[in-house]
Amino acid sequence: MSLDKGTKEEITKKFQLHEKDTGSADVQIAILTEHITELKEHLKRSPKDQNSRLALLKLVGQRRKLLEYLNSTDTERYKNLISRLNLRK
């Protein structure tokens, strides 16, 4: 259940801070959000898939930590990212 290269590149271009930015918190959070969305859809089709459920929980935890980091370092970027990704906070 991983994202294909084209999807990752598209997300990276949309959320990068500068031309060669591939690892900023914004990009990482956006990629994790897309992956979480795909896993949620998979779990709707396969509710007994416990490995995917655990992977989903792990990804949500990673995203939460990155969001906390971004909020503590740059609150304005955090608020902008939350609104762009339609995350509730």
From Swiss-Prot:
Gene3D superfamilies according to UniProt: 6.10.250.3130, S15/NS1, RNA-binding (1.10.287.10)
Pfam families according to UniProt: Ribosomal_S15
Key words, A-Z: Ribonucleoprotein, Ribosomal protein, RNA-binding, rRNA-binding
GO CC annotations on file: cytosolic small ribosomal subunit
InterPro entries, A to Z: Ribosomal_uS15, Ribosomal_uS15_bac-type, uS15_NS1_RNA-bd_sf
Keyword Glycoprotein: no
Example GO BP: translation
Entry's Gene Ontology molecular function annotations: rRNA binding; structural constituent of ribosome
Subunit structure: Part of the 30S ribosomal subunit. Forms a bridge to the 50S subunit in the 70S ribosome, contacting the 23S rRNA.
Family stated for the protein in its record: Belongs to the universal ribosomal protein uS15 family.
Function description: One of the primary rRNA binding proteins, it binds directly to 16S rRNA where it helps nucleate assembly of the platform of the 30S subunit by binding and bridging several RNA helices of the 16S rRNA.
Name assigned to this protein: Small ribosomal subunit protein uS15
Organism of origin: Chlamydia abortus (strain DSM 27085 / S26/3)
